[in-house]
Amino acid sequence: MQVAFYKGRKRLFNRLTSWWLRGPYSHVELVLGYDQAGQAICASSSMMDGGVRVKHMTLNPDHWDVVSASGSADAAWAWLRKHEGAGYDYLGLLGFVARAIGHDKSRFVCSEAVAEMLGMADGWRFDPCSLYAALAWRESSAVAAAA
């Protein structure tokens, strides 16, 4: 499977988010495959789209970093069937600013949804930048263990 991290700077919200997180990323999508037109079939939770959803997207490399990640596509689709349509976690978004605020367990931010689809524990703890770091560590550990 693949994970796409948004590094675009088009919207003020994206610039502020990446600035606050002290990293290049403001959003993340799980890439579940590609359609016949070559667009990525992505799953995440999006403020613009109102929550958890599947969306076909063009992942322009100028705006997205796409990395490989271990995980089960079947498990990701099962998670989506259970949670698709769940709202965006605005409280969790504020949690990026002040972790003590917590999050709404019935709603999701992008990184939380992607982490959970990948089978990672405590997905609510991740923001896009920390999820990128965790996946890089997880993948490098798997390579080292296989050597």
Name each model feature, range by range.
Residues M57, V66-S70, A113-G119:
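Alpha-helix C-terminal capping segments
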